[in-house]
Design a protein with these regions (language model features):
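The conserved cystathionine-beta-synthase
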Residues: 1-2, 16-19, 47
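A glycine-centered beta-loop-beta connector
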Residues: 1-13
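C-di-GMP signaling machinery
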Residues: 20-21, 25, 187, 191, ...
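Amphipathic HAMP/coiled-coil signal-transducing linker helices
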Residues: 20-41, 68-71
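Conserved helix-loop-beta segment at the catalytic/binding core of cyclic-nucleotide signaling proteins
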Residues: 86-122, 126, 130-146
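A short glycine-enriched loop-to-beta-strand structural element that forms part of the catalytic core
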Residues: 136-187, 199-205
């Protein structure tokens, strides 16, 4: 299909073979913590959609205050938080037209082809804010944050973990590859992370050129 229109009939055996190849590729590059597809399948998915000039949104998910949380509670609990986020993405963005990927660490992406991308992101934000509270001590919950050492070695107060989501709507006629889409998504995520708390930022930029 292209833009949800059938282009013609294909060979069923070839189709099944291609689906099997994609499953093997996704498993080969899957993140060991969440078992979600990694960078290579993500990049291939974006390139494929651009080639088909398909309409899609990309949401880039990243955690706020994750390093101080790891420093205070340990990497095992940090891994539990990452798995929680992966489960929420699968539950609330797992439409058969969408693609969920784990870039690495606490970074995830969802390639949305479903029309409910904004409702999905907002639901994930709410569920994350609620679910992440179970990982904190009663004292830190009461204080709505914790004391830890920042990257400069200074003792500082950090709010509870937040989820930053940057969303872009790439123009498939002006974006030539996943590199450009990744740049757009990274800029949107950077804007979302300006807040220390959970936030959703939707970028108006559709390509990396001067004219948008």
């Amino acid at each position: 299909t292209q833009d949800d229109c059938y282009l013609g009939m294909g060979n069923l055996r070839d189709l099944l073979k291609r689906l099997t190849e994609l499953k093997i590729q996704n498993a080969q590059y899957a993140n060991p913590l969440t078992l979600l597809p990694g960078n290579v399948p993500i990049n291939n998915e974006v390139d494929s959609l651009l080639k088909e000039t398909s309409d899609f949104h990309i949401a880039y998910f990243d955690l706020n205050n994750f390093k101080p949380f790891n420093d205070c509670y340990g990497y095992s609990k940090g891994d539990q938080v990452i798995r929680l986020l992966g489960e929420l993405l699968t539950r609330f963005a797992g439409h058969d037209r969408n693609f969920i990927g784990h870039v690495g660490g606490d970074d995830f992406v969802v390639v949305y082809r479903s029309a409910d991308w904004q409702l999905s992101c907002e639901r994930i934000l709410r569920e994350f804010d609620q679910g992440v509270r179970s990982f904190y001590s009663p004292k830190d919950l009461q204080n709505e944050g914790m004391w830890s050492t920042d990257r400069k070695g200074v003792r500082s107060f950090f709010p509870l973990l937040g989820l930053a989501i940057g969303v872009v709507h790439p123009d498939p006629y002006r974006c030539e590859s996943f590199h450009e889409v990744a740049e757009l998504a990274a800029m949107a995520k950077k804007e979302a992370k300006r807040s220390a708390f959970s936030s959703l930022f939707v970028s108006r930029r559709r390509c990396t050129g001067i004219a948008n």
